[in-house]
Each structure stands twice: as structure tokens, then as C-alpha cells.
């Protein structure tokens, strides 16, 4: 879901520019907490859309994603995705640690133009077969394991085909007749492809290279998996991963420019041996990520041979 959030951020920046508002990816923006009590302890923050988006692609940063949600808006996101033909992709809440109680930001340009959505949270839930979707036999809540499944009908979601088709439009936008689905220009597509394909050691300010948590191939489930060092730097993985509640997904365009191997791959796997939702015991490193790595490696080797 974070990839379309980024796409619609670029889309909205272009919309604002067409209305005469001086804002771009590199523009400095000011974030002010809307909660009055929180504003007493949380100072205004100055950043840029470029930095926020880089953090999302490099380490799947939740806080950066939440800021962009305030910028784009829930209903605007859902309406635009539906208009673009991606009606199985739906945004309903922010990201952890607590998606319903994260900071809401007012976003302004350095010229003091207010550009955040800050719409009300009365979001209409899509009426489709995902309603009533439940997972698990137990759930972890407030430090206690409770019997009963967790209802996912109000969670963020996207179908595997939506994800697959979205990334194809980003990699090869000229191949689609309906390229007006998103209001993006050539520079926007170049920007997306650049950051989708970066490793952590290629980040803007090298802030992730000094943290051992963010190893070289962090956020690259395909090809690299749990390997911490990038052994073949000729292979570029243009991707966005997702991971929550036992589900791991990678959505990618994989290319080796030297050997002329390229393919799209979108795959998801659910690992939750104890059937407890929200306990953070999901066999990601043991099962999920190695599976995704081996799947992509097998396809890559077959195409190479």
C-alpha cells in the first residue's frame, strides 16, 4: 500500500503546482502536530517529500508514510485508485506502532501554504468480498492472548494483481494507453525508479549505513533475502515490500543489465505457525523471506540459462 501512497503524493504535488502553489519534491515542508497537547512537547519538523519517499523505499519507514497519508488524504487516495482502475487497493488507517493513534500533521510549504488534507476520518468502507475477512485462531491484545480471530475488513489492503499492475506502469509507463491514470511526468517516473532500486548504502545522508539493523540489502526480499551483503550488484531490484500480521509480500521488477535478464514478480506468503495474530511471532526470517528469495532466484536462473 505504500507504493501507491508515494505515487499519489507525486500526483498531488503536480496538482498543487498546477494551482500555483510553489511546492516540489525538494521543497522544504514544515510538519506541525495538530493535537494541541502534543504540540506542547512535539516541536515542528522540517523535511522534504524527497527525504520522506527515500526513507519509505529504503527502509519502509512507517512515520514517513503516515506524513504522506496526511498529505494525500484517505478518501482522495481511495477515489484516485478506483478511478485508475485499482479498485482492490484501499487505505483505511495509518501504520504502526498504533495506526489509529499516530500523530496527525498539518503540512505547510516554507511560504506557509497549507497543503495537507486533514480530512475527517469518516471513511466509507468498500462493499466487497473482503468484508468480514478474519485470520488466526487467537489474537494478542493489551498484553493478553484472547481466543477468536482478528477482523481484517477495516485494514489497509491491496490485491496481488493491483500491486503487479501498478509496478508495471511505473517501470514502463509508455506501454499503457491510459497513462493519465496518474498525473506523473517523466521526472516523477525517473525519481520513483531510482529510489525503488536503491540499497541502504545508497541513501541520501548515509543515516542507514551506520545502523546495523539496516543491512545492505534491507527491504529486498527477492534475490537477496536475509543475506546482509549485496553479492551481485549488477542485479537491480525495483521493488516495494510489505510485511504485517504474518503476511510478507514483495512486488518487483528485477533486472541484470549486464546479462540482459529482466522480469516482473509479485508474490506473497503467510507464515503464522501458532495462529496467534499480533504477537510478532511470524517466522519471517526462518520461512517467509527465504522462500521469496529462492522463488525469485529460481526464476532468475531459469531466464539466465
Where are these regions (language model features)?
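Active-site SXXK
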Residues: 1-29, 265
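Solvent-exposed, acidic/flexible segments
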Residues: 1-6, 22, 42-50, 57-62, ...
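Residue-level preference for non-acidic, small/hydrophobic
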Residues: 2-9, 56, 81, 163, ...
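A mature extracytoplasmic/lumenal domain signature
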Residues: 5-7, 11, 33-35, 72, ...
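Short glycine/serine- and small hydrophobic-enriched flexible loop segments
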Residues: 7-15, 58, 62, 165-172, ...
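Acidic helix-start/capping segments at beta-turn-to-alpha-helix junctions
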Residues: 21-40, 72-73, 94-103, 183-196
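Active-site-adjacent helix/loop patches that line small-molecule binding or acyl-intermediate pockets
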Residues: 33-34, 43-180
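Structured C-terminal helix/loop/strand segments within mature extracytoplasmic catalytic/sensor domains
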Residues: 145-305
Amino acid at each position: 500500500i505504500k507504493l501507491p501512497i508515494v505515487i499519489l503524493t507525486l500526483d498531488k504535488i503536480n496538482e498543487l503546482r498546477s494551482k500555483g502553489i510553489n511546492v516540489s519534491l525538494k521543497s522544504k515542508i514544515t510538519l506541525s502536530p495538530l493535537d494541541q497537547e502534543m504540540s506542547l512537547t512535539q516541536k515542528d519538523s522540517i523535511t522534504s517529500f524527497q527525504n520522506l519517499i527515500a526513507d519509505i523505499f529504503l527502509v519502509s519507514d512507517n512515520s514517513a508514510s503516515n506524513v504522506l497519508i496526511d498529505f494525500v488524504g484517505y478518501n482522495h487516495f481511495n477515489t484516485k485508485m478506483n478511478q485508475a482502475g485499482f479498485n482492490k487497493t484501499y487505505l483505511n488507517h495509518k501504520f504502526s506502532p498504533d495506526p489509529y493513534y499516530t500523530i496527525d500533521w498539518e503540512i505547510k510549504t516554507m511560504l506557509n501554504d497549507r497543503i495537507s488534507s486533514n480530512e475527517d476520518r469518516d471513511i466509507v468502507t468498500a462493499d466487497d468480498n473482503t468484508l468480514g475477512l478474519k485470520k488466526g485462531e487467537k489474537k494478542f491484545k493489551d498484553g493478553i492472548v484472547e481466543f477468536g480471530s482478528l477482523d481484517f475488513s477495516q485494514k489497509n489492503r491491496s490485491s496481488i494483481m493491483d500491486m503487479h499492475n501498478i509496478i508495471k506502469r511505473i517501470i514502463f509507463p509508455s506501454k499503457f494507453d491510459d497513462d493519465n491514470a496518474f498525473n506523473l511526468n517523466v521526472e516523477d517516473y525517473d525519481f520513483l525508479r531510482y529510489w525503488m532500486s536503491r540499497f541502504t548504502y545508497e541513501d541520501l545522508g548515509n543515516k542507514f549505513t551506520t545502523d546495523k539493523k539496516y543491512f545492505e540489502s534491507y527491504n529486498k526480499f527477492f534475490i537477496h533475502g536475509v543475506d546482509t551483503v549485496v553479492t551481485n550488484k549488477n542485479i537491480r531490484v525495483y521493488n516495494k515490500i510489505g510485511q504485517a500480521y504474518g503476511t510478507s509480500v514483495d512486488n518487483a521488477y528485477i533486472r541484470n543489465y549486464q546479462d540482459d535478464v529482466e522480469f516482473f514478480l509479485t508474490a506473497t506468503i503467510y507464515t503464522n505457525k501458532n495462529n496467534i495474530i499480533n504477537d510478532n511471532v511470524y517466522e519471517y526470517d526462518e520461512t517467509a523471506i527465504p522462500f521469496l528469495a529462492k522463488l525469485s532466484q529460481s526464476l532468475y536462473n531459469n531466464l539466465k540459462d
